[in-house]
Amino acid sequence: MRFENLGASASSLALVLGIILSDGATGRAWSAPACGHACLLKVMDGFRASMTAGQPGSVPLAPDAEVRENAHPVMLAGTAWKRVKSVRSVMTFADPVTGNVVSRAGVELDDGKPGYISTRLKVAGGGRITDVELSTDTSSRVVGSYVWSLDPQFEAVLPPEQRLSRVDLEALGRRYFHSLSSHQAVADDFDAACNRFHSGQQITNVARNAVEGGPPRTCASSLEGTPPWGPATEQRFPVVDAERGIVFGVTLLHYPKVPKQPRMYVSEVFKVVGGRIVKIDNIGLMMEGVESLGFTH
């Protein structure tokens, strides 16, 4: 047996392994996802169980976790979850590519009234949570019949021919948020029967609505005209689920023409079937004095 080329052979083997374990397009070292789809769902289930049991201390937060509710830094023990008597309905979407999972929970509060809580978790290795982003509506605007019986259509898996790619889904979401600034909708992005709901209140295809007022409108026409909002800044799309046709997006919507110039924290789940938006689930919270939604790391 000859050993004089062993060092070179070992180096070559290491190089080959390095190529195999690298991303040829980016040069980044390959690694398995910190938390897959089932893992992300399990982390969210555990979070919800801990919070409804009044045990926020059992949530596996990372040491430097960022926790916010309605854009404000908070301690978990001080969030609206402490008021939750029971979770009546929930839908959850996970994205192993980004490590994010989001749930919408229609809850019964301690006074018997309905509430709507959106929870986004960013999950790192070992199931540690680095982000907790809560968008919480406990106002009288929440429609119990909607949030306590969330539409199963959102979680339904689409047949392959009705799906868009991740890239196309995110692009659709970005066009929608751009329309909030330009007031020019892309009509082809919407199904003819598309509807938008704010904490359960139907905004589109009704004679009138108590949220935006004005004449009847569609998903597309509701973005047009001369609305008091725009621009939409801090746009993020933490969860994209191509299998279910889901895009979860967040943006800070400015109202520069309104006294005190409030801003709306917009948290939306888009259901996309056959390349068109069929339903939009929104939690829109008007706030004053908020400069940023956070999570800029």
Question: Predicted regions span which residues?
Answer:
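Bacterial N-terminal signal peptides that target proteins for export
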Residues: 1-13
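Bacterial N-terminal signal peptides
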Residues: 10-24
